[in-house]
């Protein structure tokens, strides 16, 4: 699994850089994916873009991925390394998997619930990518995370409130470690308190700076979509 994760990211980025080197007319900017896993597990202090690489597999993966992308700088291409937090949206990712569990009233914090979660609403992520592409002041590492990280417990409570469901059943650490091994600590049980210092410095304004705002919007959109999708069925039943 680890070899696949490293190989896929380095191979695709390397192939892209090889292609860019052959072009006579190159793009002005390359925005390369990365993740806040670069910083390792550390929720004891705030993390900005100047913090050094952490320890662990995720940190190694992100560092190697970023190093490959930085080859674009030698080609005269402005390079932005987007260190993305947990992306929240209603059409995929972790939240889409959690929604049915929380809707059934079976949700709760992961582990002890104290680990910090650095997150970003999907719409804000898209807007930040557009801003970074358009503004030449963006270069190097860029934390793509909302300015208000929360604990796993706070996240669970906010999601429960958005769904009008209880969120008091914790997901124990043991089964996660049995399923994922030591990756469980890096991906789910460990935390990071990442702040978007560069984005704010360059004038970017988040539409969803707080977890309650983000989850209320996402849940509302999900409910509206579900209502629209069931309307033809209801109307057909009424006609018969």
Features from the language model and the residues they span:
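NAD(P)-cofactor binding segment of oxidoreductase domains
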Residues: 1-30
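Conserved C-terminal active-site "lid" loop/helix of NAD(P)H-dependent oxidoreductases
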Residues: 153-157, 179-205
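Mid/C-terminal beta-alpha module of Rossmann-like enzyme folds, strongest
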Residues: 135-182, 216-240
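Conserved beta-loop-beta element that borders a ligand/cofactor-binding pocket
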Residues: 34-35, 67-90
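Glycine/proline-rich active-site loop of Rossmann-fold NAD(P)-dependent oxidoreductases
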Residues: 63, 75-77, 88-97, 132-142
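Glycine-rich "substrate-gating" loop/helix at the edge of Rossmann-like oxidoreductase active sites
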Residues: 52-58, 85-91, 112-122
């Amino acid at each position: 699994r680890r070899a696949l994760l490293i190989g896929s990211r380095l191979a695709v980025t390397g192939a892209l850089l090889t292609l860019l080197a052959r072009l006579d007319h190159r793009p002005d900017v390359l925005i390369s994916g990365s993740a806040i896993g670069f910083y390792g597990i550390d929720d004891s202090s705030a993390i900005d873009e100047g913090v050094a690489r952490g320890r662990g597999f995720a940190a190694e993966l992100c560092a190697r991925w970023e190093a490959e992308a930085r080859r674009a700088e030698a080609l005269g291409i402005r390079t932005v390394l987007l260190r993305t937090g947990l992306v929240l949206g209603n059409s995929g990712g972790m939240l889409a998997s959690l929604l049915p569990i929380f809707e059934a009233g079976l949700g709760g914090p992961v582990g002890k619930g104290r680990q910090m979660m650095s997150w970003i609403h999907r719409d804000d992520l898209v807007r930040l990518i557009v801003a970074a592409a358009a503004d030449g002041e963006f270069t190097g590492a860029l934390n793509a995370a909302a300015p208000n990280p929360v604990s796993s417990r706070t996240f669970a409570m906010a999601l429960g409130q958005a769904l009008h469901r209880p969120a008091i059943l914790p997901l124990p650490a043991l089964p996660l470690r049995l399923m994922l091994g030591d990756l469980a600590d890096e991906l789910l049980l460990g935390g990071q308190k990442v702040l978007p210092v560069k984005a704010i410095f360059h004038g970017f304004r988040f539409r969803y700076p707080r977890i309650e705002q983000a989850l209320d919007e996402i849940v509302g959109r999900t409910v509206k979509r579900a209502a629209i999708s069931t309307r033809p069925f209801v109307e057909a039943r009424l006609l018969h």
